[in-house]
Amino acid sequence: MSFYNHKEIEPKWQKYWADHHTFKTGTDASKPKFYALDMFPYPSGAGLHVGHPEGYTATDILSRFKRAQGYNVLHPMGWDAFGLPAEQYAMDTGNDPADFTAENIANFKRQINALGFSYDWDREINTTDPNYYKWTQWIFTKLYEKGLAYEAEVPVNWVEELGTAIANEEVLPDGTSERGGYPVVRKPMRQWMLKITAYAERLLNDLDELDWPESIKDMQRNWIGKSTGANVTFKVKGTDKEFTVFTTRPDTLFGATFTVLAPEHDLVDAITSPEQAEAVANYKHQASLKSDLARTDLAKEKTGVWTGAYAINPVNGREIPIWIADYVLASYGTGAVMAVPAHDERDWEFAKQFGLPIVEVLEGGNVEEAAYTEDGPHVNSDFLNGLNKEEAIAKIVAWLEEKGFGQEKITYRLRDWLFSRQRYWGEPIPIIHWEDGTSTAVPESELPLVLPVTKDIRPSGTGESPLANLTDWLEVTREDGVKGRRETNTMPQWAGSSWYYLRYIDPHNTEKLADEDLLKQWLPVDIYVGGAEHAVLHLLYARFWHKFLYDLGVVPTKEPFQKLFNQGMILGTSYRDHRGALVATDKVEKRDGSFFHVETGEELEQAPAKMSKSLKNVVNPDDVVEQYGADTLRVYEMFMGPLDASIAWSEEGLEGSRKFLDRVYRLITSKEIVAENNGGLDKVYNETVKSVTEQIELMKFNTAIAQLMVFVNAANKEDKLYVDYAKGFVQLIAPFAPHLAEELWQTLTATGESISYVAWPTWDESKLVEDEIEIVVQIKGKVRAKLMVAKDLSREELQEVALADEKVKAEIDGKEIVKVIAVPNKLVNIVVK
């Protein structure tokens, strides 16, 4: 029995595509364009896992489909290659992160090519290539010139033992560092910030124009966090000091019975009484040891210390105590809140814990039992009594503005982007600090500012990056003799990924980021596929940079990615014991269809879970390609279920996909292919062309494959296969299983030409119409026969056909026909006696 020999066929066609540059981006200006983009990977030492190809296969299917439909297709791939893991590896092994990264990229590229993806490798980019990051640095200098890149003192997660600050993501819940388990303290340090907040309103409003999953748009809206309210000024009793509170509910001001400042607030030391000084200092120290996440955890016990000072509530002149508490962050809002315990759960818990007064100002609950957080008419609120929320807010804001105690204010949860890292393996920030106190950007003519090669990439220990150790690189002298130091911080990994989709459009341009005409031709990206874990940060940062470049006149569109699709996760098989603990697969044995712990003998429950090294359930695509072939992997991952669903990996499913491809191979190579069409497959063939075309457009690849299976089943029942239908079917399967399709195309055409640019098949709508229909024949009300007849026969013709049927003749033989009722396309009812 013949089968699809993937080990021979797949490398053969991969070599053909590479030798012929089959997937070079089309430049015919008369054709429409299609830009299919994958989120480019970080080339880790572990290589690809089977989750990567799911999204890559989806964009590859669309790219191959669009080429066949006559589009110029831009389908590129590159490497997001700066980042912490390579630096960590280099520090642990003494190797150069550049060498390690190059090896990883070579491995990733080998794996990607083995899967038959139709990338245009002439456009490959690498964020660590100076020719690439020259333009990352150029964008930074433009941000700096426009005042959107600035330096500020910001609290960072400082690890003394590592001699560096670490990102929030690298702090464990217990407040220690992920690497080494060292204590992490919050300490203010000079950092570069990007003023993303200047774009908050546009980033919010323009989401409405995008074809993105609503859930992702909502995550961005929440992250930007626009809220309308008021800034209210509180004076500190007995001093000339005051502080501002932002509140979305200024109408509840009569219920404010205390205020809370962040421990880091500028005023704290100035207003703390001598009696409270020690307690306040201790509390500030404890707060500095916690991450923002730990501090704002709603479930945690409320802690705080009174400063000994009082604020004056501007609406009623009452003296209310000023506390500090770590749930208020200096970086959020104004770093101060007014507490209305009757109507806010966190304030209520705090008031109960510390015996502070609770004053009801909205009617409807029992505020001694719990905070009432619904709306109701105002009470105990002087001139606001009886008003609803909207009326009361409008009235109090007008009153505050008239009296000079506050004003209406729109705020955003979005913070400016902390853009510097005290690391070696990143883009150098192109700024020079001069001894006269000024700073300047490195001029464009001197870019790229190349990252110097060094063996010593350990942190400097001073809070600066390892670049501070490199005196020759670090110190510069101007023409007028003024000395300066280069900026030692490097950019975060997000920098290179915020604009890479633009460089693919014109990757070898040495004069500018990309040519304007080419940007006009290709933007926006038509489809961007990647994981939902990048829903906020990467996509928000890329949108910010794109809008900035739009303002500069560099790009012609307001948004970078017109359509976004998040593929689901491919889960591994895992096992749980009676406690619910996960058990590694190498500790499991299968007996009689059940699963048992090798050591304890306990029966285990099988359940899908995220693939991980510790569970030993990671599936390597190399192994799948070796055993089943790349086309099998592609078809299986698309047939598992909807592309956006998370589904468990199944060896049985993989085998099923392989068997299907073997059936396809046999159908085309073993069936007699003929030049005459007997019409037997007209309907199913045209249905298949129509369905597969429509389902690919909708990215419903699983249903497209199901329809291809329907055609194979129907074709196998026929003695012969019409050549045009055989060719059309091979074209339909080509985006899914391209190696097999190329081989079968040669079997059918012997042209020696790739199938890639052969025009996509079309369908004949008239062939989809049923030309025959089943009708029932009833005699004395009982069904006696079912007949296939031509569609739309008249009553007379239908009656004639029914009475001529042998079965019907036998039933009515010797009986008198009283009447015949014929209903076209439905039934014939014969009344006899």
UniProtKB/Swiss-Prot annotation:
Keywords, ordered alphabetically: Aminoacyl-tRNA synthetase, ATP-binding, Cytoplasm, Ligase, Nucleotide-binding, Protein biosynthesis
EC supergroup of this enzyme: ligase
Location(s) in or outside the cell: Cytoplasm
Membrane-spanning parts: none
Domain of life: Bacteria
One GO-annotated biological process of the protein: leucyl-tRNA aminoacylation
Coiled-coil features, chain-numbered ranges: none
One Gene Ontology MF term: aminoacyl-tRNA deacylase activity
A Pfam family reported for this protein in Swiss-Prot or TrEMBL: tRNA-synt_1g
Major subcellular site: cytoplasm
Span of the annotated motif 'HIGH' region: 41-52
Binding locations of ATP: K613
Motif ('KMSKS' region): 610-614
Any single GO CC term annotated in Swiss-Prot or TrEMBL for this entry: cytosol
PANTHER family according to UniProt: LEUCINE--TRNA LIGASE, MITOCHONDRIAL, LEUCYL-TRNA SYNTHETASE
Descriptive protein name: Leucine--tRNA ligase
Lineage of the species this protein comes from: Bacteria, Bacillati, Bacillota, Bacilli, Lactobacillales
